[in-house]
Swiss-Prot record:
The mating factor alpha-1 precursor is identical in S.italicus, S.uvarum and S.cerevisiae, except for the number of tandem repeat units: 5, 3 and 4 respectively. It comes from Saccharomyces cerevisiae (strain ATCC 204508 / S288c). GO terms for cellular component: extracellular region. The active factor is excreted into the culture medium by haploid cells of the alpha mating type and acts on cells of the opposite mating type (type A). It mediates the conjugation process between the two types by inhibiting the initiation of DNA synthesis in type a cells and synchronizing them with type alpha. This is Mating factor alpha-1. The keyword Nucleotidyltransferase does not apply. Residues 20-89, 105-110, 126-131, 147-152 form a propeptide. The gene is MF(ALPHA)1. The keyword Repeat applies. GO terms for biological process: mating; pheromone-dependent signal transduction involved in conjugation with cellular fusion.
Length: 165
């Protein structure tokens, strides 16, 4: 489950719980919330490494979910210098011949990435193309479809000197 969906579920559950009427006359520990008002529920009982913290700054406020295991490791490494983590680009970067040094744009222009073979058209083919556009005939091939019961003279071939009977 992704963090935004968890965050949204807890935020809606918290807002529903805060909007519920508070009964001060009885000593009930639980708030009476109608089932229709509940948008979602997030159970964190079995997760011991998840902490929910209130968060607010000048632009945002809400609940912050953190992994306590990662937070404790990061707190221990606070004084460690990052000198050994720096790497020089020429050491690990390898470019193939002709590969650009820059990152490609998401919406690249056609001339930038399109490569045409000799004789290939610049346009997209139509779904119902005309016959002259895609039909290719070999020398001596007829333009028509052969009949199923073709006449003998049409398909019979005689060698020189061969009798007709």
């Amino acid at each position: 489950m992704r963090f935004p969906s968890i965050f949204t579920a807890v935020l809606f559950a918290a807002s529903s719980a805060l909007a519920a009427p508070v009964n001060t006359t009885t000593e009930d520990e639980t708030a009476q919330i109608p089932a229709e008002a509940v948008i979602g529920y997030l159970d964190l009982e079995g997760d011991f490494d998840v902490a929910v913290l209130p968060f607010s700054n000048s632009t945002n406020n809400g609940l912050l979910f953190i992994n306590t295991t990662i937070a404790s490791i990061a707190a221990k490494e606070e004084g460690v210098s990052l000198d050994k983590r720096e790497a020089e680009a020429w050491h690990w970067l390898q470019l193939k011949p002709g590969q650009p040094m820059y990152k490609r744009e998401a919406e690249a222009e056609a001339w930038h990435w399109l490569q045409l073979k000799p004789g290939q058209p610049m346009y997209k083919r139509e779904a119902d193309a005309e016959a002259w556009h895609w039909l290719q005939l070999k020398p001596g091939q007829p333009m028509y479809k052969r009949e199923a019961d073709a006449e003998a003279w049409h398909w019979l071939q005689l060698k020189p000197g061969q009798p007709m009977y």
